[in-house]
Amino acid sequence: MRYYGEEALGLVETVGMVPALEAADKMLKAADVELVSYENVGSTLVTIMVKGDVAAVRSSVEAGAVAAAAVGKLTARNVMPRPIGGVGDIVSVHDIDA
C-alpha cells in the first residue's frame, strides 16, 4: 500500500524475519491499521511499517514491539504522528498491494 504521509506511520524493526512476522501479525490484530511495507536491511534487519490514526498506530506498534521481543530481538520502534509527505517515497519501496 502506497504511503503518502496523510496518516500516522508506525515502524517496528527486528533482527530476523521470525520476530518481524510475529510483530506484523500482532500489529495488524491489535488496532485498525494498514500494512504499508516492509524493508530488509542487509540479511539481518527487517522493518515492518503500518499506517492509521495516531492512537491506533501507537497501540499497534506497542503490541508489535512486545511480540517481537518475546520471540527474538527488537532493535527499534517508532511512531511518527504526521510525517512529511516525502517520507512516503522512502517507506513505499516495498509497498504491499491491498
Where do the protein language model's features map onto the residues?
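Short glycine-/aliphatic-rich beta-strand segments at the starts of folded cytosolic domains
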Residues: 4-14
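Short cationic amphipathic helices and targeting signals
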Residues: 10-12, 46-51
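Short amphipathic alpha-helix segments
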Residues: 18-29
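A common structural junction motif
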Residues: 31-32, 65-73
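A short linear hydrophobic-aromatic micro-motif
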Residues: 33-38, 76-77
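Helix N-cap motif at beta-to-alpha junctions
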Residues: 51-57
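Conserved short beta-strand edge segments in small beta-sheet-based binding/regulatory domains
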Residues: 70-82
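Short, low-order "capping/linker" segments at domain edges
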Residues: 86-98
